C-alpha cells in the first residue's frame, strides 16, 4: 500500500510541539519558563538539547504525561492557526486515496498521539521515553527520532509491509528531514529551509507553502521550487 510519511512540527502543526507543550506544562503548573529559552540558545547540539528537555520530565507519572498531551492539543487546536494548511490538506488527500499515513517526528507521544487520533493517522514513529516499573518517566530516551533515525525507522516499516519506497511520499520542513525525503519516490518540501530548497531546485522536488491556518483553511496549492 502506498504510504505517506509526515514530519509534524512546521510540516503539519504550525508550532514546534515539544516547545509548545512544555511551555503549556510550565505555565499550567506555575513553574519556571525561562530555562527552555536558555536551553534553546545554548551551544549544545540538537540531541543533547533533546536529552536535557526530557530529563525535566523525570519523576512524572507516564499516564499523567499522556493525559496532559491531550489537554495541550485541545488548547492548541482551538488557536487561530494551529496547522500548516498545505500539509494538512496533503494528509487529507492521502487519507481520501486510501494511503497509509505515518507520522515521523522527534517529538513525543504526549503530543503526537492526540494529533494522530484527530487526523486519522495510522501509525506514529517518534522519540520513545523510558518508563520505570512503576509507570514513571525516568527522563531518559529509549529511541530518538531525528535525522538518520527517521530514515532507519521508515526503512523498517517498509520492509515489514513490503511496500516499495518508490510508491511512497514524504513531507518535511527541515534539513534534518533530508534522509527521509531522499528515500521515497515522491518527496515534498514544506516551507523555506534553504538546504531543502536547494535540493528541491536541483532534483525537481515539489515545495509546499508553510502558511499556518485553521483546520478548514483554504490556502493554496502546490508550487514547485
Per-region residue spans from a language model:
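Conserved catalytic-core helix/loop/strand module for nucleotide-ribose chemistry
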Residues: 60, 64-67
Amino acid at each position: 500500500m502506498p504510504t505517506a510519511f509526515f514530519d509534524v512540527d512546521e510540516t503539519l502543526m504550525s508550532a514546534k510541539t515539544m516547545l509548545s507543550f512544555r511551555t503549556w506544562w510550565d505555565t499550567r503548573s506555575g513553574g519556571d519558563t525561562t530555562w527552555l529559552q536558555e536551553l534553546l540558545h545554548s551551544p549544545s547540539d540538537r540531541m543533547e538539547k533533546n536529552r536535557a528537555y526530557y530529563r525535566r520530565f523525570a519523576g512524572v507519572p507516564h499516564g499523567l504525561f499522556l493525559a496532559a498531551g491531550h489537554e495541550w492539543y485541545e488548547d492548541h487546536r482551538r488557536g487561530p492557526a494551529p496547522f500548516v494548511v498545505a500539509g494538512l490538506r496533503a494528509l487529507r488527500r492521502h487519507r481520501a486515496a486510501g494511503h497509509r499515513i505515518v507520522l515521523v517526528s522527534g517529538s513525543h507521544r504526549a503530543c503526537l498521539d492526540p494529533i494522530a487520533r484527530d487526523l486519522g493517522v495510522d501509525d506514529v514513529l517518534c522519540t520513545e521515553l523510558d518508563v520505570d516499573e512503576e509507570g514513571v518517566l525516568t527522563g531518559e530516551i529509549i529511541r530518538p527520532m531525528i535525522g538518520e533515525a527517521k530514515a532507519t525507522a521508515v526503512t523498517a516499516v517498509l520492509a515489514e509491509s513490503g511496500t516499495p519506497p518508490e510508491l511512497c511520499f514524504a513531507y518535511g520542513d527541515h534539513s534534518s528531514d533530508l534522509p527521509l525525503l531522499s528515500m521515497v519516490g515522491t518527496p515534498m518540501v514544506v516551507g523555506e529551509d534553504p538546504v531543502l530548497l536547494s535540493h528541491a531546485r536541483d532534483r525537481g522536488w515539489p515545495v509546499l507553502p508553510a502558511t499556518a491556518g485553521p483546520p478548514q483553511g483554504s490556502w493554496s496549492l502546490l508550487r514547485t521550487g
